[in-house]
Amino acid sequence: MEKYTEIIFILDRSGSMAGLEMDTIGGYNATIEKQKAQQGQAVVSTILFNHYSKVICNRVDINEVKKMDENDYQVYGSTSLLDAVGGAIVHVEKVHKLLGKANCPEKTIFIITTDGYENSSKEFSYKKVKSLINKHDDYQFIFMGANIDAYQVANDIGISKDTTVNYCCDSQGQRLCFNSIDNAISDIRKNGKIKSNSWRAESDNYYNKNTKIRK
């Protein structure tokens, strides 16, 4: 089978995302369109989470991924971050086992965005999610966090600070968040890994500028 990349989006849709619906929808759709133009095959899964997870596409060829709209992305509820991430990893593990080594993706990328702290998971703990992530050198994880200490949360679940970003939870911050996500995916698809910090520069600069203003 021809080599391909699997991209799993795990996107927060809890109540605190209210007001940023169109920015999130637009950012996601723009990222998908940009990735369609990249060389190589890819499949996409997209999970929207609050206190439960909703799958809006499951291993769909990237060229066939439908645009997200307001019916898909409706914000409410609490934040079961651990259940969303842990559940997604376990599902992907099972799928890859069924596919067999010859049919598994060459690269597997998890994109996680959240604008709040974990507050309602029932099935997965920090320890359990960290154990899942630590055993997968073959998976790559990008963690984008707003209104939280993203580095601490990422560390608590085993994600490297090199692939973690604090971003501003406003319209511009959301746009730059998805620009950074697109840069990261493109780098991994092309080079097999993220080769420098340039992918995140816009998000970092905007966050640092606004943090200084608030202080």
Residue ranges of each PLM-predicted region?
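Acidic, low-complexity intrinsically disordered regions
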Residues: 1-215
